[in-house]
Structure formats: structure tokens, C-alpha cells
């Protein structure tokens, strides 16, 4: 069926900020879909709230709205634009839920907007747990014994019938939000109310646990002709019970018999047909390992995390084709963009193994609950491709950037066998590595299977790796064995360790005996059709399919998996750098390993290598491609950390030199530079050990800010108030990196300012200066940023421009530089300088209209700012205000403290833009998920040093009609100054404690500032966690709470007597 001619404009809803469970895969899907629809001649209107996305670039859609994803704002846009149709299946759960809400609000009927692709009835049937269960019963497809509950009492009644354990799955949520496995009554009482709270329809499915079954996924496509195909089948190495986003996944499935595969394939196609889904869909099935018995777990009637993985694993662009199906085209008339000769109705075939491993945030949150269950905890993922499962698995492991390079932990020998077994039984994020350690201690695969229910096939493959390790140890220098272990994915680093040699010695030995990787093409068809996809992976075989062209080449290093501190912003910068390189006529080559991102879409660059970002893997590609140079500025700390290794191997780093990077990071060199430039910085010193740290801190004077050098996202950064805390910190930090000292700075209380600038080696241009709402001490990535700054004087702005130009010139920057300043007592100090892309690049690009990364890349390649039209020091400011608001995923991470400080904790960001600060903040806070009400109840629980500032804040809330609740000490202080409050009792020794108030829904906002002391049992910690778990807004910075108050004041009218 040809595409529809009766519709001209299509509204596409994006997925909003990155949170755990919904990451960059939707930027990739949305970008593909928008371009695909425009290719067919439709006008595309895009709405998303996340500035750090390629899909919100003006080039991707005809009209782009960066506005909050709420019914209120979407209704305004629909009334203004009057689109013919809405496409909701490419923006994850957020877009699906919004489509349902928009339909129910009546706006779609009012404006005559049709929902494209999968119909609303099908979405509801797949998402509503009750309707889905009824459909499966109708189709005679088995689902676990289950009940739909709307109250805790209903849940208790169901458990009496079937007994524990039960799995709780809230309706219309993603990433397992609010769900979990209940083993007893205590779990049930915690998880069910939580799940009901997070479900927008206040509904949970309780089902008999089938944990331990194999979890198999089928990624399927269907068109309006009822043609349906399987794009990819995937197998979770971790069995049912661990969320698929937290599982290690392989494609194609490895342990299914032909009969099992065809049985589950047929079931998946039957379900997608019954649901009448038009587009992509993910079917999750639980298979009994000992029989042909299976259960349907769930269906996602949309593009998902799994579809991004399936697209990258097979090369089949699911989102692009789903968009064409949505406008009426059929699979047999859509050309496969990879082969350019076959049609999209041909099922992809793959002749390699793909492994996906999730990336967890527990290097940031050491105190977090690492147990994995049905609620997702990973922030990102890596993917690797190999010809054997062992090769694919080991390549994925070394892509993770945990400091782990193999199947085991760096300090594995320090663990007792008892501890290892305990960690295997507890399904945590490090279980894979503990399995490696157990195999090294000769624990049998049968015993490990008993603890984990991981299939013996996978455990056997892991045992192969350990057996080869032992062989290496016993056969030092054996060249044939060297050749063999390379085909199984062993890195030179691991071989060097086993042979007691250095990594360069192993590399040299390999090259001498011509043991080099070849590069194979990912072509969707296992070489059945001619294909010229520029998408490659390495393996140790014979025929190389990546031929070097004669064109001058530039290699861009990507930023690897998404994690806290290094998010999608760096992928955004990478994609813009690639576009600039292509525009200037060079061949753009990307090396990256993140399956969720736009940079790993093979149609973006001239060549894509899907490889680990390690010295060995990158150098082999560079040896083959022989580029003019490598760009490390846009790949975050991942790429920066490779710079010195590449330079030692004779590779040219383009843009700011290694020396510039080192000067900015090395305390002594940087201090000398600042003295020479006459730019002040807070008093600071360095230390390698506890003794020196204590001496230096006492000379500087507490409080001090301590951090390791060469880190991103404020990792391991703290404000320390005394010797005892500093001693604890040093013991932990020295463990973080023994090669670089700990930096100790005087902590200045003041206004934090952030500046991004572009330099061409001679001149410097500043796209924008941003002011943070939270004072210095809160990590810049967790602060609300305002552009343009609202409280800086003309003189301060002139000083900031002057310092920025001097620093760019002094560091000989070519490309981007990010500088953080603090304004304290009238003086401007430099806090930190990074000669690379920062996480504010997308935000500034969107609000100023300056394509920051693109211009920077052109400067790196020799263009001059004045020739590109940038002749001023700073960009002109428009007549609007924009705010960047951080978004957190605390509800998914148990036991993580929500207090904001110098270590970054946010996973994503949104933007709010309007004519004044209050309106911009309203939009930004709303987009971040904060429901702003003009009345309610605020709970204050404040430490002594903040009580005075909190009093003014409480008075402000009281003036606009909020009731003030307090804990005892705070209440007494507020009452002394005439403020009327209601006091709630202390934790554990009161009939109505502060925790009861939160749990009973008697509090709308919590404002809590911390008392010093790190124990998780501290009252403040328990208050903050309770607020997070019950979905109550919790502010730990008075500055952020004050910003909310300003918004509420602008919405309200004060009432007062004469």
C-alpha cells in the first residue's frame, strides 16, 4: 500500500529527559523516525523537553518545540499547529502515556488529530495489565497465575491463594518502575503501595514468580497488510527475575533448540497480529529450561531499548521502517537501507554473536542497593560483536570502563570463596565477575547453575575463558596459543599479565607474528546480498572487509556507555563533530560501543567501528585507517583518558594538545599558569597520603573541597569539615587512583558561574555565560543553570570574558573549553577548567542558536572564527530566559542519598524557556516532573547553620498559602520568630513521626538540609529516602526550594491586611 496522501503534518512526541529505564535509545529512534518521515515528504513537528538530543536539532524536524511533555503544553501546541496526525510509538513510555492522556482529555477529537501506527486500543491492550491478560487467555497463550490489584488489601488476598514469591508489575510504567519481587509480607507492604503510586492508572499486576526461567525476547515488525517478520531474537543470560535492561543479553539466542525457536517465533508473530500493532514491538517470553512450557511476560507496543539493541545488532533500522509503516507503507515496498537491493520484508540474518552488558552507577553510589530484580538500575549499556560468544563477551566487558578488563575483578584474589559464593547468590551488578572468580577457584559450573539458574551453556563458555587463562599461565611465549586466545577475545593487557610481560611487549610480539584483527561488515543478511554498509567489528580471522579509501580521514572517539557524569550530551557533541568533518570534505570515522546512541547509527558517519574504547582496540583501527589525526575533545573522560596513550604511539591529537589537557589537570602547572595570567583561584594544595592531606587542610582552613584529579562528574568529590572526615576520604580516594594526587581546595561559598567558549588558536568566542541557582558546592551537572545570567553586573561579565580569553590563550586551546567560576565577596575565582566539550554544549547550542560543537570542530580543522562569522567576544543575548534543570533517578536506586553536593547524581536534564525567569523555571521544573501547586504543605527539617535562611523561605511559603510542618528543633526556631507551624514527631519515638506524615500523604514538599555525618541511619537520610519512595518532592538545597517559591509567587496573589 503506498504512503498516505491525506495527511501532511505529523506531530512526533519525544521521550523527555534521560532517566534509568529510558535513555538515549529514544533519541536514536526519534531522530531516525523524523528523518524517515521527512524523506517521504511529510512536515514533522517535534516536541521534546530534553535539549541534549539530536532529535531536537532544527535540521531533524520542520518545527521543533522544546517544551514540557505534559497534556497542558502539548494541548497548546496541538491547538496552535493543528497537525493531521500524532505518532506516539517512538518516544518510549512517556509518549505512549501522553497519547492515552491526550485522547482522554478530548483534545485529539477536538482538533481532528489521528493517532498513527499502533492504534490506541492496541496500546491499551498491551499496556493495561488486565486487558493484556484477557487477550492472552483469548489466544490460549499462557501467562503466569496473576491478579490485577488496585489496593494493598486486594494484593494480600491474592497472595493467600497462591503464596510467595510474587512479582509486582505496575501498569503503564517502564524500566520496572515501582515493581519488584515479594518474598514475604514485609516486601508486599513496601512494594505494592509504591507500585500503585507510580502507575498512572493506579493498577498493578501481581503474578506468581517464575524467576529462574529463561528470558527470551523477539523484536517483531508488522504492517497494515498483516505482513509480520522477526527482526532479531535475543536471549538474556540472566534468567527471569532480573529486568531485561539489567541483564546481559546475547543475539541471536544461543541455547534454544530449533523447535523451541520456531515455537516462540510463531507465538510472537501471533501476538503482534492479535494486537494489530503497526510498526515495531518487543515480546518477552519466559521458557522453562526443562520442558517446552512457556509464559508470555509482556509486550511493548513501541520502539524500546531492545529495539535499539536489535537495530545495532542486525543493522536493520527498526525506527526508520516503523515510521514508514505508520504512514501506510508496507514492508514489501520499503527498500532495506542497508543492502539498498532487498526489501524490508526480508528477515535479517547474522553470522556473529552480539553481547550487551548493562552499565550500572554503583561506582558513583557505593552505598546503593546493588541487588538486581524487576526494577531497572542500569544507566546505560555497551555492546560488542564477535565471531564467538567468548570474544563478544570479553570485548563487551572491556567496553564497560569499570577498570575491569576481563572476566574477573582486579582484586579478585583478595576475596574468600565464601564471600564469592555469597555475591553470586545475591544477584548483584558484579555477579558476572564473581562467577569468573568462582571458576578460577574450581567451583563447578553445576554448582554455579544451582545458585544462579544461568544456563550451563553460558557457564561453560565462561569456563572456557578461565581454562584458556590457565593454559596461558603454563605456556608462556607459545605463539599458537597467543593466536588462539586472541580469537576468543583476550586483550593484550590480560595476556601480558599472565605471561608476566608488558602490554607493549605483547603487542609487538603479535605484530611480529602477524596476529592482527580483521574487520567484518554488519550487513543484515550474513553476506547473502551485496551490501556496502560502512559498519564494522573486529575479529581474529583472515579476510578483512574494511578497505581503506584514499580520502583524508579524521577519527572521532565516542564517549562509550551512558553513566552518571558522562551522559548523552557527549554523544550530541560527537555527532555534531562528525557532521562538521564531513562538511569540510574529510572522511569521518567513529569508534564507539554504545548501542543506544545516534553516533553509532551507521548512516551518520562515513565509517563506524563498533569497538571497545581501549588503547589496543583503537590503535589497531588507527594502524589500518592511518588518519590525519584523532579527535578526543567530544568523547568525555573516556576519550581524554586515551589521549596520552595515543600520543605515545605517534598519533596526532587534533585540537587542544595533550600538553593543554595536562596543564589544566595538573595542580602545580595550572597554578603557575593562573599566577602568570593574574587570575585568582581558591587556595589549594595536593596530597598523596593522609598525613600531607591533614597538614594541608589545616593550613587552608576547613571546610575544604577534596577531589581526585582526572575525573568527570565530580566522582569521589566531597566537602569535608574536619580531620576525621578527611582521613576517611583519603583512605577511600587513594584507592580510586594511585597515579594522580588528591586536590584539596578552600571551599568558597558563592555564586557559581559556568562558561563555554570556542577558540581557533588565536581568537576566542563565548556562546554564553550561565549562572547556577545553587551556590558553589553543588555539582554543576546537578545545578539549575540560567541563561543569560540574571544577577551579574556589567563589570563581572567583562571580567569573566577577560579571564576566559586569557585562559583559552594561555592553554593554547583549539576547539572547546569549559570553565567554572565562583563569585565570592565581590571577587571572581576560577574553580575548574576543562579544555574539551562539556555537558552544557547542547543546552547552549539550543538556547543561543550557535552550533557550538560544529563550530569548534571546524576550528580544530583550521577554520578561523572570523571567517565563520564570529567576530565578537560573546554571542548576542535574545529577549528570553532559559533554564536547564537536572533530572534524577533516585526512585530506582534504593539506599542512595538524595542530598546534592559536589559529586554528580543526576541522569538527565530538561529545558524551560520563556520571557522571564519565573515562567522559564515553571516550565523547567514541570518538565523535570515536579508538579507545581499554589498551595499545600511544606515540611522543613533544617540543620542549625541553615535555620536563618530557611526561616525566610518558610515565611515566603506561608505568605502564598502553604501550611508549614516542621520537626521539633526547626519548629521551635521558627516559632520564636512568630511563624505558625505544625510540629511532627521524631523518627521512631512518636505516634505521628515525620516518616508517617510523608507516608500518609500529609506532605507535598520536603525541605531538608543535612547534618554532618555519613551514616545511612541518620534521620535526614531516612526522611529523604522516604520522600523519594513516596514520590514527594524533596529539596536538599535551599536555593532550589527558593527557585520553586519564586515560581509559586509568580502564579499566586498574596493576600494581606492593610
From Swiss-Prot:
Region (Carbamoyl phosphate synthetic domain): 547-929
Signal peptide range: none
EC top class, as a word: ligase
A single GO molecular function term of this UniProt record: ATP binding
Region (Allosteric domain): 930-1058
Domain of life: Bacteria
Binding site for Mn(2+) 1: 284, 298
Record pathway: Amino-acid biosynthesis; L-arginine biosynthesis; carbamoyl phosphate from bicarbonate: step 1/1; Pyrimidine metabolism; UMP biosynthesis via de novo pathway; (S)-dihydroorotate from bicarbonate: step 1/3
Residues of the MGS-like domain: 930-1058
Domain ATP-grasp positions: 133-327, 671-861
The keyword Repeat belongs to this UniProt entry's keyword annotation: yes
GO cellular component, one term: cytoplasm
Positions with a binding annotation for ATP 2: 707, 746, 748, 752, 777-780, 820, 832
Cofactor: Mg(2+); Mn(2+)
Complex and partners: Composed of two chains; the small (or glutamine) chain promotes the hydrolysis of glutamine to ammonia, which is used by the large (or ammonia) chain to synthesize carbamoyl phosphate. Tetramer of heterodimers (alpha,beta)4.
Function: Large subunit of the glutamine-dependent carbamoyl phosphate synthetase (CPSase). CPSase catalyzes the formation of carbamoyl phosphate from the ammonia moiety of glutamine, carbonate, and phosphate donated by ATP, constituting the first step of 2 biosynthetic pathways, one leading to arginine and/or urea and the other to pyrimidine nucleotides.
Name the UniProt record assigns to this protein: Carbamoyl phosphate synthase large chain
Species of the source: Fusobacterium nucleatum subsp. nucleatum (strain ATCC 25586 / DSM 15643 / BCRC 10681 / CIP 101130 / JCM 8532 / KCTC 2640 / LMG 13131 / VPI 4355)
Amino acid at each position: 500500500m503506498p504512503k498516505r496522501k491525506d495527511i501532511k503534518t505529523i506531530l512526533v512526541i519525544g521521550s523527555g529527559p534521560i532517566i534509568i529505564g529510558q535513555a538515549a535509545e529514544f533519541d536514536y529512534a526519534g531522530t531516525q523516525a523524523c528523518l524517515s518521515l521527512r524523506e517521504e515528504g511529510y512536515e514533522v513537528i517535534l516536541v521534546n523537553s530534553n535539549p541534549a538530543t539530536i532529535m531536537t536539532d532544527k535540521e531533524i524536524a520542520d518545527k521543533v518545540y522544546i517544551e514540557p511533555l505534559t497534556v497542558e503544553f502539548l494541548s497548546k501546541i496541538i491547538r496552535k499547529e493543528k497537525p493531521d496526525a500524532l505518532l506516539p510509538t517512538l518516544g518510549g513510555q512517556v509518549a505512549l502515556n501522553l497519547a492515552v492522556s491526550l485522547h482522554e482529555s478530548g483534545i485529539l477529537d477536538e482538533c481532528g488529530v489521528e493517532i498513527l501506527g499502533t492504534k490506541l486500543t492496541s496500546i491499551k491492550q498491551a499496556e493495561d495489565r488486565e486487558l493484556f491478560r484477557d487477550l492472552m487467555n483469548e489466544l490460549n497463550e499462557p501467562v503466569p497465575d496473576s491478579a490485577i490489584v488496585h489496593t494493598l488489601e486486594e494484593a494480600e488476598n491474592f497472595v493467600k491463594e497462591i503464596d510467595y514469591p510474587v512479582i509486582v508489575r505496575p501498569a503503564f510504567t517502564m524500566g520496572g518502575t515501582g515493581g519488584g519481587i515479594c518474598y514475604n509480607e514485609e516486601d508486599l507492604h513496601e512494594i505494592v503501595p509504591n507500585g500503585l503510586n507510580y502507575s498512572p492508572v493506579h493498577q498493578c499486576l501481581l503474578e506468581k514468580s517464575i524467576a529462574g526461567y529463561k528470558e527470551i525476547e523477539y523484536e517483531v515488525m508488522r504492517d497494515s497488510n498483516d505482513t509480520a517478520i522477526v527482526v532479531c531474537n535475543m536471549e538474556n543470560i540472566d534468567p527471569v527475575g532480573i529486568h531485561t535492561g539489567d541483564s546481559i543479553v546475547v543475539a541471536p539466542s544461543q541455547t534454544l533448540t530449533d523447535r523451541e525457536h520456531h515455537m516462540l517465533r510463531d507465538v510472537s508473530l501471533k501476538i503482534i497480529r492479535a494486537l494489530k500493532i503497526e510498526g515495531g514491538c518487543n515480546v518477552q517470553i519466559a521458557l522453562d529450561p526443562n520442558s517446552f512450557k512457556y509464559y508470555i511476560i509482556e509486550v511493548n507496543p513501541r520502539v524500546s531499548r531492545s529495539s535499539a539493541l536489535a537495530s545495532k545488532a542486525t543493522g536493520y533500522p527498526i525506527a526508520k521502517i516503523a515510521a514508514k509503516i505508520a504512514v501506510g507503507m508496507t514492508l514489501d515496498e520499503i527498500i532495506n537501507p542497508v543492502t539498498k537491493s532487498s526489501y524490508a520484508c526480508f528477515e535479517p540474518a547474522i553470522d556473529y554473536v552480539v553481547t550487551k552488558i548493562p552499565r550500572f552507577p554503583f561506582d558513583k553510589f557505593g552505598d546503593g542497593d546493588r541487588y538486581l530484580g524487576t526494577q531497572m538500575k542500569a544507566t546505560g549499556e555497551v555492546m560488542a560483536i564477535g565471531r564467538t560468544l567468548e570474544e563478544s563477551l570479553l570485548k563487551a566487558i572491556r567496553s564497560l570502563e569499570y577498570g575491569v578488563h576481563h572476566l574477573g575483578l582486579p582484586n579478585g584474589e583478595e576475596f574468600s570463596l565464601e564471600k564469592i559464593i555469597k555475591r553470586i547468590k545475591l544477584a548483584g551488578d558484579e555477579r558476572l565477575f564473581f562467577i569468573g572468580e568462582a571458576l578460577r577457584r574450581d567451583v563447578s559450573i553445576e554448582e554455579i547453575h544451582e545458585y544462579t539458574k544461568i544456563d550451563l551453556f553460558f557457564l561453560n563458555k565462561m569456563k572456557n575463558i578461565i581454562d584458556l587463562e590457565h593454559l596461558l599461565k603454563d605456556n608462556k611465549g607459545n605463539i599458537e596459543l597467543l593466536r588462539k586466545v586472541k580469537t576468543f577475545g583476550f586483550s593484550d593487557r590480560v595476556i601480558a599479565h599472565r605471561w608476566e610481560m608488558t602490554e607493549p611487549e605483547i603487542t609487538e610480539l603479535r605484530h611480529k607474528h602477524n596476529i592482527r584483527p580483521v574487520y567484518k561488515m554488519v550487513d543484515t543478511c550474513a553476506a547473502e546480498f551485496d551490501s556496502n554498509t560502512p559498519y564494522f567489528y573486529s575479529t581474529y580471522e583472515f579476510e578483512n572487509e574494511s578497505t581503506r579509501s584514499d580520502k583524508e580521514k579524521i577519527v572521532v572517539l565516542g564517549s562509550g556507555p551512558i553513566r552518571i557524569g558522562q551522559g548523552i550530551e557527549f554523544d550530541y557533541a560527537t555527532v555534531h563533530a562528525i557532521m562538521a568533518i564531513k562538511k569540510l570534505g574529510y572522511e569521518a570515522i567513529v569508534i564507539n560501543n554504545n548501542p543506544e546512541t545516534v553516533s553509532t547509527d551507521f548512516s551518520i558517519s562515513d565509517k563506524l567501528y563498533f569497538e571497545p574504547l581501549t588503547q589496543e582496540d583503537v590503535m589497531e583501527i588507527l594502524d589500518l585507517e592511518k588518519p590525519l589525526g584523532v579527535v578526543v575533545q567530544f568523547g568525555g573522560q573516556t576519550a581524554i583518558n586515551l589521549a596520552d596513550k595515543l600520543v605515545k604511539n605517534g598519533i596526532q591529537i587534533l585540537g587542544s594538545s595533550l600538553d593543554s589537557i595536562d596543564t589544566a589537570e595538573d595542580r602545580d602547572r595550572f597554578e603557575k599558569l593562573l599566577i602568570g595570567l593574574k587570575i585568582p583561584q581558591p587556595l589549594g594544595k595536593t596530597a598523596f597520603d593522609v598525613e600531607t592531606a591533614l597538614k594541608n587542610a589545616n593550613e587552608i582552613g576547613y571546610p575544604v573541597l577534596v577531589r581526585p584529579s582526572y575525573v568527570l562528574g565530580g566522582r569521589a568529590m566531597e566537602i569535608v569539615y574536619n580531620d576525621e572526615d578527611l582521613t576517611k576520604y583519603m583512605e577511600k580516594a587513594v584507592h580510586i587512583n594511585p597515579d594522580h594526587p588528591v586536590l584539596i581546595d578552600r571551599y568558597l561559598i558563592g555564586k557559581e558561574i559556568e562558561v563555554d567558549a570556542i577558540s581557533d588558536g588565536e581568537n576566542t568566542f563565548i556562546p554564553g555565560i550561565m549562572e547556577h541557582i545553587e551556590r558553589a558546592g553543588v555539582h554543576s551537572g546537578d545545578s539549575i543553570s540560567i541563561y543569560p545570567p540574571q544577577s551579574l553586573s556589567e563589570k563581572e561579565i567583562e571580567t569573566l570574558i577577560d579571564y576566559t580569553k586569557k585562559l583559552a590563550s594561555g592553554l593554547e586551546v583549539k576547539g572547546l573549553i569549559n570553565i567554572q567560576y565562583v563569585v565570592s565577596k565581590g571577587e571572581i575565582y576560577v574553580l575548574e577548567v576543562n579544555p574539551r566539550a562539556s555537558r552544557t554544549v547542547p543546552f547552549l547550542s539550543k538556547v543561543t542558536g550557535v552550533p557550538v560543537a560544529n563550530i569548534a570542530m571546524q576550528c580544530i580543522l583550521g577554520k578561523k572564527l572570523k571567517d565563520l562569522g564570529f567576530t565578537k567576544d560573546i554571542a548576542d543575548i535574545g529577549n528570553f530566559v532559559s533554564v536547564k534543570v537536572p533530572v534524577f533517578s533516585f526512585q530506582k536506586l534504593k539506599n542512595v542519598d538524595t542530598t546534592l553536593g559536589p559529586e554528580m547524581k543526576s541522569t538527565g536534564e530538561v529545558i524551560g524557556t520563556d520571557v522571564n525567569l519565573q515562567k522559564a523555571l515553571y516550565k523547567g521544573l514541570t518538565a523535570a516532573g515536579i508538579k507545581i501547586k499554589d498551595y499545600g504543605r511544606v515540611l522543613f527539617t533544617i540543620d542549625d547553620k541553615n535555620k536563618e535562611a530557611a526561616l525566610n523561605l518558610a515565611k515566603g511559603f506561608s505568605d502564598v498559602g502553604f501550611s508549614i510542618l516542621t520537626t521539633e528543633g526547626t519548629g521551635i526556631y521558627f516559632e520564636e520568630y512568630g511563624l505558625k507551624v505544625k510540629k511532627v514527631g521524631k523518627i521512631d519515638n512518636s505516634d505521628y513521626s515525620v516518616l508517617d506524615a510523608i507516608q500518609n500523604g500529609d506532605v507535598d514538599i520536603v525541605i531538608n538540609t543535612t547534618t554532618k555525618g555519613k551514616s545511612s541511619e541518620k534521620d535526614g537520610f531516612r526522611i529523604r529516602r522516604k520522600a523519594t519512595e513516596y514520590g514527594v518532592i524533596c529539596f536538599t538545597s535551599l536555593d532550589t526550594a527558593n527557585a520553586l517559591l519564586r515560581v509559586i509567587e509568580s502564579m499566586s496573589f498574596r493576600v494581606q491586611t492593610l
